[in-house]
Amino acid sequence: MVEFPSLSPYWPLIRFLVPLAITNVAIDLGEQALNRGIATVKEDAVEMLASYGLAYSLMKFFTGPLSDFKNVGLVFVNSKRDRRKAMFLLVTAGVTAFVLHILIAYTDLGYYIINKLHHVDESVGGKTRKAFLFLAAFPLLDALAWIHAGILLKHKYSLIVGSASISDVVAQIVFVAILLHSNLECAEPLLIPILSLYMGALVRFTIVGLGYYCNIHDNIPDTSGLDVGGDATIKKMLSFWWPLALILATQRISRPIVNLFVSRDLKGTSEATEAVAVLTATYPVGHMPYGWLTELRAVYPAFDKNNPSNKINASSPVTKSHIKKFTFCCLALSLMLCFVLFWTPHVSEKILVDVIGVDYAFAELCVVPLRIFSFFPLPVTLRAHLTAWLMTLKKTFVLAPSSVLRIIVLITSLVVLPYMGVHGATLGVGSLLAGFVGESTMVAIAACYVYRRQVSSPGWTQQLLTVYPSSVGRGSLLIRSKQLCLS
């Protein structure tokens, strides 16, 4: 009779990740709701979708680095003093992003970035800069929510984080529906998705803020004890945050770069506007089945034995081996979802028509780009799993080169593929996939480097001799080291 291993160690992982996965999917659904708010506008819908898509993707470049304060809260915030230091860094970065938004909206810098580089006409360029101005305060509001989400995750309150994100999306959908019946549709249609975006973020910030103050604020010390290394310094937070911020910035700038090259490749014609609109519509739909895999980055730090919330329950059955197997199952599920949604005939078209509200002819243009998205889960899972391990070790500095390689591979693909007959949205998504593969490869190399440094360090050898005093010889030590690192 076959005996199945106990599933009990996996329930904490499932309970932790499911709300985060729902969070990620909810964000994509929110994007689709915002796109629908524009697509429903009958006059110049494609032009409006392209303008909002350009502004939104540029804005995401700023929200990306700031949203990684979630990981600062997850790894570093053990006391009220740690939180104050993290908030100081966050507000400084948010104000900087606000000023840059104003400069891009009102100066020749914005005209050059949007009109000249993207080769869009005056109408699209003007609407894009206006939308970018309206979005100036969003990065700071978004980051305030994320840092408290990270603190909640540290204490395993992922359900509150997931509920906040679902409420965010519900608020966006409700406000889109309300504003579509207002005079904004005629006066300023761009404000429909933008105001809905702000209201959703405000709801999310309110929920995670209340969750923090009701469940955590009074239960953490004013200062960190020596058992967790004392209070974190601003320097340590910065050195931990900047590689993650750089990586996320390059991930977020990838979309504007893709929009830029796709638009220039088609030389600013109506086909270029259509291609950017296709990319705007396919990004959230294609991202939905695999985007939640990124949340695997939070698993290792949350279940790390050095996490103060885990020291209370030292008998937790979750091991590194359980996390690896759980990660593989998540990958398999994501691949299955991608191939069912994007390769089953007419399913992806129906999603685009029914959810976003585009016409069927436009939806058919999105089929091939969506099928390319089916291969994204592989590099995303590898990157998330290894990044989580490096975050636990606080060795994020080795991840910085991966962002550089991602941009190099992305731009190379965008330049080379048109000579092979690939154009439009297919060019954009295919180049994104190449960039993901390049980035994940570099992350794997960085993880191998850190692993070998750990194994060869004198302290590591002493730890092995302490744990396994009967082991004699280098061969036995190497075997034991693999057991400790990888099991």
Swiss-Prot record:
Transmembrane segments: 7-27, 86-106, 132-152, 159-179, 190-210, 326-346, 362-382, 407-427, 428-448
Subcellular location: Membrane
Recorded GO CC terms: plasma membrane
Keyword annotations: Membrane, Phosphate transport, Transmembrane, Transmembrane helix, Transport
Superkingdom assignment: Eukaryota
Main location: membrane
Membrane topology of the entry: Multi-pass membrane protein
InterPro entries the UniProt entry points to: ANKH (IPR009887)
One GO BP: phosphate ion transmembrane transport
Gene Ontology terms for molecular function: inorganic diphosphate transmembrane transporter activity; phosphate transmembrane transporter activity
Family in the record: Belongs to the ANKH family.
PANTHER family in the cross-refs: PROGRESSIVE ANKYLOSIS PROTEIN HOMOLOG
Known function: Regulates intra- and extracellular levels of inorganic pyrophosphate (PPi), probably functioning as PPi transporter.
Protein name (database record): Progressive ankylosis protein homolog
Organism: Tetraodon nigroviridis
Gene (UniProt): ankh
